[in-house]
Each structure stands twice: as C-alpha cells, then as structure tokens.
C-alpha cells in the first residue's frame, strides 16, 4: 500500500503541470475538460486504478460491509472528442477495459466482492467507511500505517 501512495504522489506531480483541474473528486468529476494530453489521460487512469485498489482494500477488510456489498461497480471515465465526462456502466465482469471506435479512451473498472473468512475476526468502526467517501487524498489512518 505504501507503493500505491508513492505512485499517487508522482501522478499528482505530473498532473499539477497540466491544465487539468487540480482537485479531482471521484464522485464529482468535472464534466468538460478540453484537450487532455495523453500523459494526463494515463495519469488519470492510474489514479482511478489506485482508487479502485484502495476501495477494494477497505471493503474487503470490513465484515459488515462485505456481507452487504457482494458486488459493486465503479463508473468509467470516457474521453470523447477531447471532452472528458463520467459515465456509469453496469457490468458483471471482474475487471474490464472496453474500447469503442467512437471513443478515444474508455476506462471501466468493476470488481466483484469476495468475502474473506479471516475478516470476520476483526472489528472496525463506522468511521472507516465514512472516510472512504472522502476520497483517496484523505485515507483512514489504518490505511497509511500498513
């Protein structure tokens, strides 16, 4: 997990030098960002992947959540004619990246939850879940310590 944090830091440095909006919140992505460079597109894909792994890590460790969310799907990010906007696509595949001729880039992340038997022996507070919705830039303290 420390490696993910280092990668995220490097990605943030690259994105700071671009015209991309600085503070990207994954549940409220800006609707239109014109003329994204290829570097920024890759950086954004890496950030989404880091966020996906972070969410999987949190959800897989919390028994009360893993019993309720057997499967959940992440939205995909679509870059279409240099316009950047989020679109939510439902799928049952574990991890999909699909491309269509009309779209420059489509990134679709979805994951099917697998309950860990050893997670039943742990107990976590509700703040761990609420911290998840604040985004990757503000992770819970237990995530940083591992």
UniProtKB/Swiss-Prot annotation:
It is a single-pass membrane protein. Pfam families: Pombe_5TM (PF09437). InterPro entries: 5TM-prot_SCHPO (IPR018291). It is found in: Cytoplasm; Nucleus membrane. Keywords: Cytoplasm, Membrane, Nucleus, Transmembrane, Transmembrane helix. It comes from the Eukaryota. Its main location: cytoplasm. The keyword Transmembrane helix applies. The chain crosses the membrane at residues 38-60. GO terms for cellular component: cytoplasm; endomembrane system; nuclear membrane. Belongs to the UPF0742 family. This is UPF0742 protein PB2B2.17c. It comes from Schizosaccharomyces pombe (strain 972 / ATCC 24843).
